[in-house]
Amino acid sequence: MGYRSDVAYVIKFNDIETRDNFVTLMLAKNDAQLTQAINECEYGYTKDPIITFEATDVKWYSDFDDVKAHHALMHDAVEIYKEKGGKYRFISIGEDGAEECDEDDDDGDLYDYITTRHEINTAFPHIPTEDSTLTTQE
């Protein structure tokens, strides 16, 4: 079975043209893993120059080729397009609740796109008051 995580990241550029050029450049590398990673992302946003990725309940090990490709996208965005706004924010939450955050986002601009929130949701059945074992102290 193995340890599973929920992961998400956002890559942002200064403008749509730069984002689209980045996607074209990554696809032009003819690297099967990079192509698969790009195809797993959303980048058709018409008003926001971002690339997004989200996966739940996945095995996200740093030595897996697909994981390396996703991290390469984030790092290449900064390495190649830093002067054109290339930056990213990555967050994963493991099945044990452990969080990992990696980012190159000096101004905190990407925080609005991706954050974490731990919460407990319950669906306890309703107990009629007369059957309740709850006692109050006076």
Predicted regions and their residues:
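Short, extreme N-terminal segment that most often corresponds to the first beta-strand
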Residues: 1-27
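Charged interaction segments
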Residues: 23-138
